[in-house]
């Protein structure tokens, strides 16, 4: 039988990291078994579902590279199918109409809670003969009264629920719309889902869904319920811990490879290995190796992974992601070197693409002012001779390559009888406006001859003004 998994988010908000990890695990299991991955939008909560949330989910999935083989399917477009199944269940006697009012159900629940009992419907209408009435009703599933529901969870091991703990679940509301637990069952059956990977908050839904599947004569999928993700303080991960939306991580300069690598390790491991390519994830991933204990989100670890991928992936690929951040920071990419060259020059130090874009600004536009600390230390009168001489050599050079530029700086230092730093640091501040940059030969090459000469002139004017003011 072909393995088929699904990710089935509700479009009531963004794609958060917990959902993204569940989607990743489900996607990896399908890919590792040569199977298919289905995307299903569970939008039966019409009041809370929005198109904006659907778009955010699709955008997050696409950005992470979690491509789906089928879908996206929408539950609201399948209402006729749900009604067809409910009609059959009524006919087969596995479901019934319940005319109990909300007031009666509420009173029953309050009485049970006062008695220290778990609230559940008492099946008053279960054996009722068909009624000739216009009174509003819900439709309930006839849950078995005896026995138990057992299933082997790939994460948590054997789980068992007594049927006496389960009441007769509402599968259709008074307005005729089907309920979540029922729609999920029909969808998984119709779509041939063989593995259900989801959060541990769905464990209590599982026995109810299994009983409905059995009543329909449908095959049962296998289940894997993954633990929640916690913040670094041990509380459930939320906005107060920082970014929780997948696209917020994009906005903060993370690569999809870094987030994917981090999330796969947040509850799953393969020995001591930390870095996983997508190919390795697919080859090595196993549902049975997922840890059933909650995992704590560690931003520093994610940053470390992000820096690793910025340094190690193809600069041309990094540049594709960097372009979004350059545009976001209103940096004109047409007014400077090609982005892959910027990535090659700056990737060694950058932890995020936001940082990389910010530090690249002087390659594309004039800096407003010199960094005060760097200028005070390095743009002093004593630096004037070095800047004048290196400017002359740069102006007359026809070779604007890294080795030639390095030689010019070296020759300037030798002629003046000073160390390389006495030439290099004033030149760096002149060219970039600050005290940090890639190697000077690379920086000069990327900024270009004309722009570099103008910036040295600007630094010389700064020194002259400093002398005049003293």
UniProtKB/Swiss-Prot annotation:
HAMAP family, per database record: Glu_tRNA_synth_type1 (MF_00022)
Protein purpose: Catalyzes the attachment of glutamate to tRNA(Glu) in a two-step reaction: glutamate is first activated by ATP to form Glu-AMP and then transferred to the acceptor end of tRNA(Glu).
Protein name as catalogued: Glutamate--tRNA ligase
Enzyme Commission number: 6.1.1.17
Residue numbers binding ATP: 239
Keywords: Aminoacyl-tRNA synthetase, ATP-binding, Cytoplasm, Ligase, Nucleotide-binding, Protein biosynthesis
Native species: Psychromonas ingrahamii (strain DSM 17664 / CCUG 51855 / 37)
Keyword Transmembrane helix among UniProt keywords: no
Any one GO cellular component localisation term in the record: cytosol
Oligomeric form and interacting partners: Monomer.
